[in-house]
């Protein structure tokens, strides 16, 4: 588990970055070097099957489980119509196994600070800070309890 987190950090270093990216791909992890990541990223269970869009921003102390997809909902668009947009994952967020977090071109989907996205949830719009969302499509279920 810690090895995958180390590879994610190493992917930005000259020289070793190519080796780290190749190792991530062998492990089934697509985590482009362009993804901005804050400190304390946790990828439990080796993050097998993790796919992260190249324009994603991930805050501090975020936990992302295996099989998560963060990307565009309108992948059929090309050219100028597909420009812009991203997912922003703020600090202290947990994204459960198999969850899908999507944005539309030209827009931003934000997972607010301290929010929890349940396992296998499909998030199609921004999640306010401190809320727990689950289901397909994902909807708020309750407020998360602040960690002590």
Predicted features and spans:
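Left-handed beta-helix
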Residues: 27, 33, 38-39, 44-45, ...
């Amino acid at each position: 588990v810690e090895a995958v987190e180390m590879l994610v950090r190493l992917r930005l270093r000259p020289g070793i970055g190519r080796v780290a990216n190749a190792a991530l791909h062998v492990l089934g992890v697509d985590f482009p070097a362009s993804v901005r990541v804050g400190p304390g990223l946790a990828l439990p269970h080796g993050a097998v099957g993790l796919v992260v869009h190249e324009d994603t921003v991930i805050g501090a102390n975020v936990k992302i489980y295996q099989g998560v997809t963060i990307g565009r909902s309108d992948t059929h668009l090309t050219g100028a119509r597909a420009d812009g947009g991203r997912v922003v994952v703020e600090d202290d967020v947990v994204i459960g196994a198999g969850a899908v977090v999507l944005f539309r071109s030209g827009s931003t989907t934000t997972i607010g600070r301290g929010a929890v996205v349940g396992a296998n949830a499909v998030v199609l719009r921004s999640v306010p800070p401190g809320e727990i969302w689950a289901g397909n499509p994902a909807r708020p279920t309750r407020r998360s309890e602040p960690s002590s």
